[in-house]
Amino acid sequence: MTIAKLIDHTALKPDTSKAAIMQLLEEAKTHQFASVCVNPTWVSLAAKELAGTGVDVCTVIGFPLGANTTAVKAFETKDAIENGATEVDMVINIAALKDGEYDAVEQDIRAVVDAAKGKALVKVIIEACLLTDEEKVKACELSVKAGADFVKTSTGFSRGGATAEDIALMRKTVGPDIGVKASGGVRTKEDVEAMLAAGATRIGASAGVSIIKGDQSAPSKDY
Protein backbone atom coordinates (compact mmCIF):
# COMPACT_ATOMS: atom_id res chain seq x y z
CA MET A 1 0.00 0.00 0.00
CA THR A 2 1.30 3.45 -0.91
CA ILE A 3 1.64 6.26 1.62
CA ALA A 4 -1.03 8.17 -0.31
CA LYS A 5 -3.58 5.47 0.51
CA LEU A 6 -2.99 6.11 4.22
CA ILE A 7 -3.61 9.88 4.02
CA ASP A 8 -6.84 11.83 4.48
CA HIS A 9 -6.09 14.85 2.26
CA THR A 10 -7.46 17.62 4.43
CA ALA A 11 -8.79 21.17 4.16
CA LEU A 12 -10.75 22.31 7.22
CA LYS A 13 -9.85 25.96 7.68
CA PRO A 14 -12.95 28.17 7.82
CA ASP A 15 -11.81 30.42 4.97
CA THR A 16 -11.12 27.61 2.50
CA SER A 17 -12.51 28.74 -0.86
CA LYS A 18 -14.34 26.67 -3.46
CA ALA A 19 -11.31 26.98 -5.72
CA ALA A 20 -9.10 25.54 -2.97
CA ILE A 21 -11.54 22.67 -2.45
CA MET A 22 -11.56 21.92 -6.18
CA GLN A 23 -7.77 21.84 -6.13
CA LEU A 24 -7.87 19.47 -3.14
CA LEU A 25 -10.24 17.15 -5.00
CA GLU A 26 -8.09 17.13 -8.13
CA GLU A 27 -5.02 16.34 -6.04
CA ALA A 28 -6.89 13.52 -4.34
CA LYS A 29 -7.86 12.01 -7.68
CA THR A 30 -4.36 12.38 -9.09
CA HIS A 31 -2.53 10.91 -6.11
CA GLN A 32 -5.26 8.51 -4.94
CA PHE A 33 -5.38 9.56 -1.30
CA ALA A 34 -7.51 7.47 1.05
CA SER A 35 -10.01 10.30 1.36
CA VAL A 36 -10.50 14.01 1.36
CA CYS A 37 -11.50 15.48 4.71
CA VAL A 38 -13.58 18.62 4.28
CA ASN A 39 -16.07 20.65 6.27
CA PRO A 40 -19.72 19.55 5.96
CA THR A 41 -20.62 22.38 3.59
CA TRP A 42 -18.31 20.84 0.94
CA VAL A 43 -19.42 17.21 1.24
CA SER A 44 -21.95 17.28 -1.61
CA LEU A 45 -19.43 18.82 -4.00
CA ALA A 46 -16.73 16.38 -2.95
CA ALA A 47 -19.03 13.38 -3.36
CA LYS A 48 -20.03 14.51 -6.84
CA GLU A 49 -16.48 15.20 -8.00
CA LEU A 50 -15.00 12.02 -6.50
CA ALA A 51 -17.70 9.58 -7.58
CA GLY A 52 -16.10 6.47 -9.05
CA THR A 53 -12.54 7.54 -8.26
CA GLY A 54 -11.90 5.28 -5.27
CA VAL A 55 -11.31 8.30 -3.01
CA ASP A 56 -13.61 8.45 0.02
CA VAL A 57 -15.31 11.57 1.35
CA CYS A 58 -14.66 12.32 5.02
CA THR A 59 -16.14 15.15 7.05
CA VAL A 60 -16.11 16.39 10.63
CA ILE A 61 -18.78 16.24 13.33
CA GLY A 62 -19.01 18.48 16.42
CA PHE A 63 -15.90 20.16 15.10
CA PRO A 64 -13.59 21.50 16.41
CA LEU A 65 -14.69 21.83 20.05
CA GLY A 66 -16.81 18.72 20.58
CA ALA A 67 -19.23 20.85 22.58
CA ASN A 68 -22.35 20.33 20.47
CA THR A 69 -25.14 18.32 22.03
CA THR A 70 -25.32 14.63 21.25
CA ALA A 71 -28.53 15.12 19.24
CA VAL A 72 -26.82 17.69 17.04
CA LYS A 73 -23.84 15.40 16.44
CA ALA A 74 -26.18 12.58 15.42
CA PHE A 75 -28.05 14.91 13.06
CA GLU A 76 -24.81 16.20 11.58
CA THR A 77 -23.77 12.62 10.92
CA LYS A 78 -27.02 11.69 9.17
CA ASP A 79 -26.93 14.89 7.12
CA ALA A 80 -23.32 14.30 6.08
CA ILE A 81 -24.08 10.74 4.99
CA GLU A 82 -27.11 11.89 2.99
CA ASN A 83 -24.81 14.37 1.26
CA GLY A 84 -22.33 11.64 0.36
CA ALA A 85 -19.87 11.28 3.25
CA THR A 86 -18.46 7.79 3.76
CA GLU A 87 -16.30 8.64 6.78
CA VAL A 88 -16.95 10.98 9.72
CA ASP A 89 -14.44 12.32 12.24
CA MET A 90 -16.27 13.33 15.42
CA VAL A 91 -14.93 15.25 18.41
CA ILE A 92 -15.70 13.84 21.85
CA ASN A 93 -17.26 15.89 24.62
CA ILE A 94 -13.90 16.83 26.11
CA ALA A 95 -15.29 18.57 29.19
CA ALA A 96 -17.48 15.58 30.06
CA LEU A 97 -14.48 13.28 29.81
CA LYS A 98 -12.39 15.49 32.08
CA ASP A 99 -15.29 15.69 34.55
CA GLY A 100 -15.44 11.90 34.70
CA GLU A 101 -18.87 11.72 33.05
CA TYR A 102 -17.93 8.58 31.16
CA ASP A 103 -21.46 7.38 30.42
CA ALA A 104 -22.22 10.69 28.72
CA VAL A 105 -19.04 10.48 26.64
CA GLU A 106 -19.82 6.92 25.57
CA GLN A 107 -23.41 7.80 24.71
CA ASP A 108 -22.21 10.78 22.68
CA ILE A 109 -19.91 8.57 20.62
CA ARG A 110 -22.47 5.80 20.32
CA ALA A 111 -25.07 8.21 18.92
CA VAL A 112 -22.74 9.04 16.05
CA VAL A 113 -21.82 5.39 15.55
CA ASP A 114 -25.51 4.46 15.42
CA ALA A 115 -26.27 7.28 12.98
CA ALA A 116 -23.45 6.09 10.72
CA LYS A 117 -24.05 2.36 11.12
CA GLY A 118 -23.30 0.51 7.90
CA LYS A 119 -22.94 3.74 5.95
CA ALA A 120 -19.79 5.49 7.15
CA LEU A 121 -16.67 4.82 9.19
CA VAL A 122 -16.50 6.70 12.49
CA LYS A 123 -13.24 8.17 13.74
CA VAL A 124 -13.27 9.61 17.26
CA ILE A 125 -11.09 12.66 17.87
CA ILE A 126 -9.95 12.68 21.49
CA GLU A 127 -7.95 15.98 21.31
CA ALA A 128 -4.99 14.37 23.05
CA CYS A 129 -3.16 17.63 23.73
CA LEU A 130 -5.85 18.56 26.28
CA LEU A 131 -5.82 15.22 28.10
CA THR A 132 -3.66 13.45 30.65
CA ASP A 133 -2.38 10.02 29.68
CA GLU A 134 -5.05 8.46 31.88
CA GLU A 135 -7.73 10.49 30.11
CA LYS A 136 -6.34 9.50 26.70
CA VAL A 137 -6.62 5.84 27.68
CA LYS A 138 -10.16 6.33 28.96
CA ALA A 139 -11.22 8.17 25.80
CA CYS A 140 -9.89 5.33 23.67
CA GLU A 141 -11.57 2.69 25.82
CA LEU A 142 -14.91 4.50 25.57
CA SER A 143 -14.51 4.85 21.80
CA VAL A 144 -13.96 1.12 21.41
CA LYS A 145 -16.86 0.32 23.73
CA ALA A 146 -19.15 2.60 21.72
CA GLY A 147 -18.28 0.85 18.47
CA ALA A 148 -16.01 3.38 16.75
CA ASP A 149 -13.82 2.31 13.83
CA PHE A 150 -10.88 4.62 14.63
CA VAL A 151 -9.49 6.83 17.34
CA LYS A 152 -7.81 10.04 16.24
CA THR A 153 -5.35 12.28 18.05
CA SER A 154 -6.34 15.83 17.25
CA THR A 155 -8.48 18.38 15.47
CA GLY A 156 -5.48 20.42 14.38
CA PHE A 157 -7.19 23.46 15.90
CA SER A 158 -6.08 23.16 19.53
CA ARG A 159 -2.70 23.73 21.15
CA GLY A 160 -1.01 20.57 19.92
CA GLY A 161 -1.16 17.87 17.30
CA ALA A 162 -0.12 14.27 16.91
CA THR A 163 2.89 12.81 18.70
CA ALA A 164 4.42 9.38 18.30
CA GLU A 165 4.05 8.87 22.05
CA ASP A 166 0.30 9.48 21.92
CA ILE A 167 -0.08 7.20 18.91
CA ALA A 168 1.77 4.42 20.72
CA LEU A 169 -0.41 4.84 23.82
CA MET A 170 -3.59 4.87 21.75
CA ARG A 171 -2.54 1.79 19.80
CA LYS A 172 -1.68 -0.07 23.01
CA THR A 173 -5.09 0.84 24.42
CA VAL A 174 -7.31 -0.05 21.46
CA GLY A 175 -5.43 -3.15 20.33
CA PRO A 176 -4.85 -4.32 16.76
CA ASP A 177 -8.39 -4.19 15.37
CA ILE A 178 -9.22 -0.48 15.67
CA GLY A 179 -7.70 2.18 13.44
CA VAL A 180 -5.53 4.95 14.86
CA LYS A 181 -5.34 8.26 13.00
CA ALA A 182 -2.55 10.79 13.51
CA SER A 183 -3.50 14.37 12.70
CA GLY A 184 -2.20 17.83 13.42
CA GLY A 185 1.35 18.84 12.56
CA VAL A 186 2.12 15.89 10.27
CA ARG A 187 3.95 17.68 7.47
CA THR A 188 6.74 15.47 6.09
CA LYS A 189 7.31 11.91 4.94
CA GLU A 190 9.49 11.44 8.01
CA ASP A 191 6.61 12.57 10.24
CA VAL A 192 4.36 10.03 8.55
CA GLU A 193 6.89 7.24 8.94
CA ALA A 194 7.28 8.02 12.65
CA MET A 195 3.51 7.90 13.16
CA LEU A 196 3.16 4.63 11.25
CA ALA A 197 6.00 3.09 13.24
CA ALA A 198 4.21 4.08 16.46
CA GLY A 199 1.01 2.36 15.37
CA ALA A 200 -0.98 4.78 13.20
CA THR A 201 -2.98 3.36 10.31
CA ARG A 202 -4.25 6.65 8.90
CA ILE A 203 -2.79 10.14 8.62
CA GLY A 204 -4.69 13.42 8.46
CA ALA A 205 -2.72 16.15 6.73
CA SER A 206 -3.13 19.22 4.57
CA ALA A 207 0.39 18.74 3.20
CA GLY A 208 -0.39 15.40 1.57
CA VAL A 209 1.05 16.26 -1.84
CA SER A 210 4.29 17.54 -0.31
CA ILE A 211 4.50 14.45 1.88
CA ILE A 212 4.27 11.94 -0.93
CA LYS A 213 6.70 13.94 -3.05
CA GLY A 214 9.18 14.12 -0.17
CA ASP A 215 9.18 17.92 -0.23
CA GLN A 216 10.88 19.19 2.93
CA SER A 217 9.51 22.71 2.38
CA ALA A 218 5.92 21.74 3.11
CA PRO A 219 3.96 24.71 4.48
CA SER A 220 4.00 25.05 8.26
CA LYS A 221 0.31 24.55 8.89
CA ASP A 222 -2.04 21.90 10.12
CA TYR A 223 -5.36 22.07 8.37
From Swiss-Prot:
Q: In which pathway does it act?
A: Carbohydrate degradation; 2-deoxy-D-ribose 1-phosphate degradation; D-glyceraldehyde 3-phosphate and acetaldehyde from 2-deoxy-alpha-D-ribose 1-phosphate: step 2/2
Which family does the record claim for this protein?
Belongs to the DeoC/FbaB aldolase family. DeoC type 1 subfamily.
Which of UniProt's keywords are assigned here? Cytoplasm, Lyase, Schiff base
Predominant place of localization: cytoplasm
Catalytic activity, per the record?
2-deoxy-D-ribose 5-phosphate = D-glyceraldehyde 3-phosphate + acetaldehyde
What are the TM regions of this chain, as residue ranges?
none
**Entry annotated with the keyword Cytoplasm:** yes
Q: What is the E.C. number? A: 4.1.2.4
This chain's function reads: Catalyzes a reversible aldol reaction between acetaldehyde and D-glyceraldehyde 3-phosphate to generate 2-deoxy-D-ribose 5-phosphate.
Name under which the protein is recorded: Deoxyribose-phosphate aldolase
Active site per UniProt: D89 (proton donor/acceptor), K152 (schiff-base intermediate with acetaldehyde), K181 (proton donor/acceptor)
Please list the disulfide bridges.
none
| Enzyme class name | lyase
Where can this protein be found? Answer: Cytoplasm
Write down any Gene Ontology CC term.
cytoplasm
Q: Which GO terms describe its biological process?
A: 2-deoxyribose 1-phosphate catabolic process; carbohydrate catabolic process; deoxyribonucleotide catabolic process
Q: Which GO terms describe its molecular function?
A: deoxyribose-phosphate aldolase activity
Which HAMAP family does the entry mention?
A: DeoC_type1
Q: Which NCBIfam families does the protein's record reference?
A: deoC (TIGR00126)
Q: Does the keyword Metal-binding apply?
A: no
Q: Which domain of life is it from?
A: Bacteria
